[in-house]
Structure formats: C-alpha cells, structure tokens
Amino acid sequence: EGYIGRAFDLSRVFEYKWTVNLKFLPEPIFVSKTTAAVLLAGHAGVLALFILTRWLHAQGGGLAGVWLLLRTAPPADAPPLSPYHMVRMLFVSNFIGVVFARTLHYQFYSWYFHTLPFLLWATPLPLVARLAIFAAIEYAFNVFPATTASSGILAAAHTLLFVGLFVGPAEGERLCRHDDCGSRRKLE
C-alpha cells in the first residue's frame, strides 16, 4: 500500500492507553470504525467550510473563490494573498487536523505548539480567554497518563480556539490596532 492508502486506513486501530485527546470516550467507541469515519468526515467538512467561507473571502468566497483559485492565470485585478493570510491558512488547516485527529499522543504537541500563539492572536477572543486556552492545552499535555478530565479540558480548549478562529476575521478583514486600517476591521 502507498502513503495515501495507509494514511487513511480506517481499519487501523490505535491504542487507547496512549490517547491524549479522546480519553473521555469509552474504549469501544474510541476504537470503532464509526468514530474514525466521523472524524475523517468532520475533518474534510470543516476544511471545506473554511475554504469556502473564510480562506477565499478576498477572492469572492464560495465556489466562485474556488474557481478563481483553480484558474491557470488569475485575473490581473485579483487580490493577492497576503503573507499573514498564507500563514494563517497553513496553521489553521494544521490545527483542524489536530482537532479531528483519531488520536493525539504526547509527542504530537510539538507538532502544533509553536503555532498556538499565532492562532490565539488571530481570534477576536479577549486576552484572558487566549491565555486560559493556552494554559488548558499545556495542562492537558502535561498530565500523564491522560485522564477523562485532562482529555475533556483539551477538547474544550480546542473547541474554543476553533470557534474563535471561525468567527474571527476572514482575509481582507484582518484585525488591527491602528487608526489607519484601510479595509481591515479595527479592534473594539
């Protein structure tokens, strides 16, 4: 089997004792093929949702934005993607993969830890909420072995960050703190 076949092998079973993110599920549910399929479908669906509603906002959003992106030569008046937007797309897409992972082990924290400050500050959440989310994620990955509570805290923190990223500004609406924001939305 090739990489793609093995990467999406729904018959593979992960060891329940090592999971950090889904320890709040009973083991039979954790190892079920239905759970694996739901997580994979959720991952694909949320990526599509972000593509259609958040990431291609400056290109017109929706399927029109996808069409513009897929064209061989974008029109001269097509707005360029900013470096901020590119980094945000990459970090958010990685985070979506983390949220919908069938299992996260302790070493996976290093896979996305360095993106958390950027992601947290890309949300409209208050400072105290950002710091609480960061502390909750840090706590969850420092409990060994993972417990139902630490896993639930991680899921709650991921959910709050995810919602903050979704309701936050789309490309072309980047939050800024200065009076001269151009087309960007100002922080309240």
Please state what every model-predicted region is.
Residues 13-34:
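Juxtamembrane membrane-water interface segments that cap and precede transmembrane helices
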Residues 1-13, 33-188:
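Multi-pass membrane glycosyltransferase architecture that uses lipid-linked
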